């Protein structure tokens, strides 16, 4: 039976207003769907608020539980056990997810703890998590597999209410995606009422992606599912840089540096720029090439990829 969460949802809206924001309709739809026990897939443009759409539902659920406990004088002021597992395929961006969610937790005045567990996590932090997991844990598919292999995994994950798979398109159809699906299958066997939500901005096969994330072949283990479509009307201006001489193009070695001057011109004509490359080695080559061409940019531009030291990535 569906329940109302008037006080909890009002607090979410008030927090948005206090920050000068207004919640999107798709965010409200995801909150409501989660509170009704549903799972699904959020398809919305990059930067449109998918993280808050997926993370605030569990917070509202806990707020409502405390409201009910308050009527009997049993309000719990301690951080709850693990309730949300947030799986991200990109370790380099996991820290940003933690900061975004922790800001919401702090702004709402909740005792929740938000933690991070990736290959960068220190041994001291791992030891703390072994004693008690945070209320919300951001991790990777590989770290999830290690967690599930532990002798006490089922007991430690018994309080889990929600699994969020961020950037689902990055995992769909590859080995890491299969690893994630296997982990989700085990978690659902342990808790058939577990809710699962995927987030993506660039899916073309939405229904297939939903089926892989929340299979409907076993009704006993599959809750009500839905696709929530959010902001998609972003205006994109595309400009193509073409080499002046296309007879010969360096497909090996310093791929693309023949366009260095043209890229520099594009950067100088913009307020802020992200330069993406296909692989990490090309990122290193481009960073070096830009600095050699513009030494005065030292300290103004940064290199970022998953193989860099975690402190360097945080600084960038």
Predicted segments with their positions:
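Helicase motor core with emphasis on the C-terminal RecA-like subdomain
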Residues: 1-18, 22-41, 45-48, 53-316
């Amino acid at each position: 039976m569906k329940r109302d969460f008037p006080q909890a949802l009002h607090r979410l809206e008030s927090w948005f207003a206090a920050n000068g924001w207004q919640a999107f309709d798709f965010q409200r739809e995801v909150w409501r769907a989660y509170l009704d026990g549903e799972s699904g897939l959020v398809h919305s443009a990059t930067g449109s608020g998918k993280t808050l759409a997926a993370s605030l539902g569990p917070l509202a659920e806990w707020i409502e539980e405390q409201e009910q406990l308050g009527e009997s004088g049993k309000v719990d002021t301690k951080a709850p056990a693990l309730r949300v597992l947030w799986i991200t395929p990109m370790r380099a961006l996991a820290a940003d997810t933690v900061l975004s969610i922790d800001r919401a937790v702090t702004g709402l005045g909740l005792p929740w703890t938000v933690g991070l567990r990736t290959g960068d996590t220190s041994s001291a932090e791992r030891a703390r998590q072994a004693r008690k997991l945070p209320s919300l844990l951001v991790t990777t598919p590989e770290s999830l597999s290690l967690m599930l292999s532990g002798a006490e995994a089922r007991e430690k994950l018994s309080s889990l209410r929600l699994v969020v798979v961020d950037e689902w398109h990055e995992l769909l159809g590859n080995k890491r995606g299969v690893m994630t699906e296997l982990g989700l299958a085990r978690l659902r066997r342990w808790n058939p009422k577990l809710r699962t939500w995927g987030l993506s901005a660039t899916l073309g096969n939405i229904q297939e992606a939903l089926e892989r994330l929340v299979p409907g072949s076993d009704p006993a283990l599959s809750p009500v599912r839905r696709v929530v479509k959010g902001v998609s009307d972003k205006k994109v201006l595309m400009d193509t840089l073409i080499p002046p001489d296309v007879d010969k193009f360096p497909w090996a070695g310093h791929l693309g540096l023949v366009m260095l001057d043209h890229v520099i011109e594009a950067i100088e004509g913009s307020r802020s720029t992200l330069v993406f490359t296909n692989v990490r080695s090309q990122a290193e080559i481009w960073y070096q090439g830009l600095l050699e061409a513009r030494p005065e940019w030292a300290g103004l531009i940064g290199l970022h990829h998953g193989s860099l030291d975690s402190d360097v990535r945080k600084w960038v």
